[in-house]
Design a protein with these regions (language model features):
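Membrane-embedded alpha-helical bundles of multi-pass transporters/translocases
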Residues: 35-44, 49, 131-234, 239-295
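Membrane-helix interfacial "entry" motifs
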Residues: 19-28, 125, 129, 203, ...
Length: 301
């Protein structure tokens, strides 16, 4: 570890405080500021779930769903899926036969529940715009063990990406989420024209699967960036400025939330694919930037 270690004793306790040279302190603060600059644009894109993605759900997404797709709009079905995911995770992680048996029973019960729910489907299910807000927290819970398994396997092989690289990958994944939205929007009317078409009864709508898939991708990007970013700040921040640097992370998040309005400014008379294209561009430029300074970030990490 760079720098000197200063020890102070108080009774039987010994506290070690890392002392950095002015040069090391400066390098770490600069590295953190570079990360803050990047995450601003991630949160700007990610928090479109409360703005343009909700507009899209309200104005361009089908108002009903049938068949297997409709099961995603029942919270109990989502809970069953979570039980299956964690049951599988436990099944492969357990070292005793009893634990594996319990995990297997949980999985079978959840599958039986889903099978029963599917057989009981009758007609269509209404789909309102606010219901799409359930998918981000659902995917956070469901994907956490998946991401742990992936990076655990990479770590055992000595190939796990560093925290700064995960942040860059998170930006690329976020870009992929809005690329999905671009594909879903080709051929659609502008929001203003869609509003007129809805009033005239001639509007066309897209499948809810587009938004569900986008939330899936964006949530995986969040799992790459958010916990890794906080961990990076905690690890790299100079001891004297740790609180300030952690505050800087939340300031960057707040600025990103404020900038979500940029997409709303062009929502109206612009083709939808251009709106999503702006967000794709922001994420890609941010990813290119963080990979261009990766050596500086990994040096202090």
């Amino acid at each position: 570890m760079e720098g000197n270690i200063k020890q102070t004793s108080a009774g039987k306790e010994t506290t070690k405080v890392e002392e950095l040279s002015p040069r090391e302190t400066k390098d770490r603060i600069i590295a953190l500021c570079l990360v803050f600059a990047v995450v601003i644009f991630f949160w700007m894109a990610f928090h479109q779930n409360g703005l343009t993605l909700t507009y899209f759900a309200d104005e361009f997404t089908a108002k009903s769903s049938t068949g297997l797709e409709s099961m995603m709009f029942d919270v109990w079905n989502l809970v069953a899926i979570i039980f299956i995911v964690y049951g599988l995770f436990s099944l492969f992680q357990s070292s005793t036969g009893k634990s594996k048996a319990i995990s297997g029973i949980v999985i079978l019960l959840a599958l039986a529940f889903l099978g029963y729910r599917y057989s009981s489907l009758n007609g269509s299910v209404p789909v309102d715009a606010p219901i799409f807000q359930q998918f981000n927290p659902f995917f956070v819970v469901a994907l956490t063990p998946v991401s742990m398994a992936i990076f655990g396997a990479l770590s055992r092989k000595g190939k796990e990406p560093s925290a700064p690289r995960k942040i860059g990958l998170g930006m690329l994944v976020a870009a992929c989420g809005f690329i999905l939205m671009m594909f879903s929007s080709f051929g659609l009317l502008t929001p203003e024209a869609q509003s007129e078409a809805i009033q005239a009864g001639t509007a066309s709508f897209v499948s809810p699967n587009w938004l569900i898939s986008t939330y899936l991708v964006l949530t995986f990007g969040e799992l790459l960036l958010s916990p890794m970013g906080i961990s990076f700040v905690s690890k790299v921040a100079p001891p004297k400025y740790k609180g300030m640097m952690m505050g800087g992370w939340f300031v960057a998040t707040a600025i990103g939330n404020y900038l979500t309005a940029v997409a709303a400014w062009i929502w109206g008379d612009m083709p939808l694919w251009i709106v999503w294209g702006v967000l794709v561009g922001v994420c890609l430029v941010s990813a290119v930037f963080i990979f261009s300074v990766m050596k500086k970030l990994e040096k202090v990490a």
